[in-house]
C-alpha cells in the first residue's frame, strides 16, 4: 500500500522551444536558397519568314549581270564591226584572242595588217581577169539594186530612214558597165552567187527589218572599208588605172556611212538582245556572200 500511496513524481514541464533552439535542432545537409540563379536567355534571330528588307537584300546578292558583247556599249553597228574584224582575222590567219591590249595597240595592229594586205597584192599573190571582174561588177550591181529597191519601195517605217543616203551604188555600177561595153567587152548575166544572195535579201526584208538592215549596212561597210581598194587595184592592173564610178560618191564616203551608222544605232536601241544576236549572225552571212562575189574576180 505504501508503494501505492507513494506520490507519483511530476513530469517535468517540456521546455519551450525558442526560435534559436529550433534553428539549432533542425539541420539539413544542404542549404536552400530562395534566390534564383540568373539564367542566360539567347534571342533566336533566325526567323522562318524573312522580312521584306531581308528579301530585297537577298535578291540583290543573287543578281548577276551578263557580260557585254564587244562594242555593245556603243551600238549595234559597233558589234557588227567586231564580227567583221573577227572574220577578217580568222580568214587571214591573224586571229588574236587577247583582250588585254589597249585600243591604241589594236589600231596599230590593224594598220599593220592593212599594210600587209597591200604587200600581198603587190606581190601578185592573185591574178584578176577581166571576165572575172565583169562578173564581180554584175553581181555587185544586182545586190546593191536589191537593197536600194527594197528600202525605196517598202512600206516598213524602219526602211524609210535609209532612203537616199548618198551611198547608193547601183547607178554608178551601171555607168561602169556601160563604159566596159564600149570597150567591146561582153557583159555576163548575174552568177548563181549573186542571184542567191539577192533572193535571200528579199526574204529577210519581208521577215525581219533588223536582219535585213544588218545586211544593208554590212554591204555598204564592206565596199567602203575594203571593196573600193580592191576595185582600184584591179583597175590599175586591167583597165590602165581608170577611176570607176563604183568608187565615186558625192561627198565623203565615210561621213555618209557615219550617217547610216547613227540611224541604225538608234533603231538598234529598241531591239531585244535576241534580235541583236540574230543580226550578228546575219552580219557573218553578209560577209560570206560578199566574199564569194569577190572571189569571182579570180575565177
Curated annotation (Swiss-Prot):
UniProt tissue specificity: Widely expressed at low levels.
GO molecular function: heme oxygenase (decyclizing) activity
Observed phenotype of the null mutant: Slight reduction in plant size and chlorophyll content, and early flowering.
Acidic residues compositional bias, start-end: 105-122
Transit peptide, start-end: 1-83
One GO biological process term: heme oxidation
Cellular component, GO annotation: chloroplast
Regions of compositional bias (Basic residues) in chain numbering: 58-67
Keywords assigned by UniProt, alphabetized: Chloroplast, Photosynthesis, Plastid, Transit peptide
Biased composition (Low complexity): 1-15
Residue numbers spanned by region Disordered: 1-20, 45-70, 96-126
Function: Probable inactive heme oxygenase. Binds protoporphyrin IX, a precursor for both heme and chlorophyll biosynthesis. Plays a minor role in phytochrome assembly and photomorphogenesis.
Family that this chain belongs to: Belongs to the heme oxygenase family.
Descriptive protein name: Probable inactive heme oxygenase 2, chloroplastic
